[in-house]
Amino acid sequence: MAVDFSMRQLLEAGAHFGHQSHRWNPKMQPYIFGTRNNIHIIDLAQTVPALHAALQAVSDTVARGGRVLFVGTKRQAADAIAEAAKRSAQYYVNSRWLGGMLTNWKTISGSIQRLRKVDETLEGGAVGLTKKERLMLTREKEKLEKALGGIKDMGGVPDLLFVIDTNKEQLAIKEAQRLGIPVAAIVDTNCNPDGISYIVPANDDAGRAIALYCDLIARAAIEGIGRGQGALGIDVGASEEPTAEELPANDDVVASVASDAIAPADVAALAESTEHFEQLAAPRGAPDDLTKLTGVGPQLVQKLNDAGVWHYWQIAAMQADDVAKLDADLKLNGRIARDGWVEQSRAFVEAAAA
């Protein structure tokens, strides 16, 4: 089910107000309805289908297991961007775009690892450090968290960018273009629409309008998560917040996904291993492809492996206290329960054992 909104919502949010006519970008001419009191008025008849297309792109990306990066560093967008990304289990940059955040991911990953190390040191009580050293570490953590906190669990470059204000976020858009990453953006009358995959002509300054865009994109991402879980055969109706998506009628879909995700050598041990959660020093046979779990990238796989988790049957056996402990140990901020890893793992296990 597509995310619904109306033209009236856009009107009430002020999405149709562009900039003063002398501040326009001529490339936005096709999207301008007219001029009133020297202010360009955006043609919402074009905005509505364009926004629908962007929402569908976000939903499809997440349903395939992709990652969406919300980008909005201007003051009036920062809070809405962060809230929407967190609510939809996605990622965000709302402070300052660092050069190379996409094109030099290896260096950015090093900074993220430094953030994790500093965080662990401080949470461990910073034993052996002087008061001055603890203060310096605290300041370093705050600086790194502000710059990288929204992408520290992303695990790799995103599959789609959602951008507020293409003028301010030109560097992010250029990096995405270099890597072939599609961009969905709110494009005002003073912006250049070139290079934007999903152009949404609308006001990018009004706080109420920005909040509406972010809410719609977040809802589209959440819908995509539900669709992705449905395609895996997960019982979304048993979740704390079930979605309205229907499970696929063809059980072969689940079987084919599970056969790729679980090594055949593990199936014989499933009955013995799923009664209780256990952490292993090494995988039993070939490790499972944990990246098939929602929101799991290579870095999260490494963290899980370091914690002794290699197989779906381990995660499938987790009870509430096991989830809480592992989540706290790995600082996952509730991701295991939120993204439904246990339910997904059980679906893989059951399909492989059938």
Swiss-Prot record:
Belongs to the universal ribosomal protein uS2 family. This is Small ribosomal subunit protein uS2. Pfam families: Ribosomal_S2. It comes from Methylorubrum populi (strain ATCC BAA-705 / NCIMB 13946 / BJ001). The keyword Electron transport does not apply. Gene3D superfamilies: 5' to 3' exonuclease, C-terminal subdomain (1.10.150.20), Glucose-6-phosphate isomerase like protein, domain 1 (3.40.50.10490), Helix hairpin bin (1.10.287.610). One of its GO terms (molecular function) is structural constituent of ribosome. GO terms for biological process: translation. Keywords: Ribonucleoprotein, Ribosomal protein. It comes from the Bacteria. PROSITE patterns: RIBOSOMAL_S2_1, RIBOSOMAL_S2_2. InterPro entries: Ribosomal_uS2, Ribosomal_uS2_bac/mit/plastid, Ribosomal_uS2_CS, Ribosomal_uS2_flav_dom_sf. The lineage of its organism: Bacteria, Pseudomonadati, Pseudomonadota, Alphaproteobacteria, Hyphomicrobiales. One of its GO terms (cellular component) is cytosolic small ribosomal subunit.
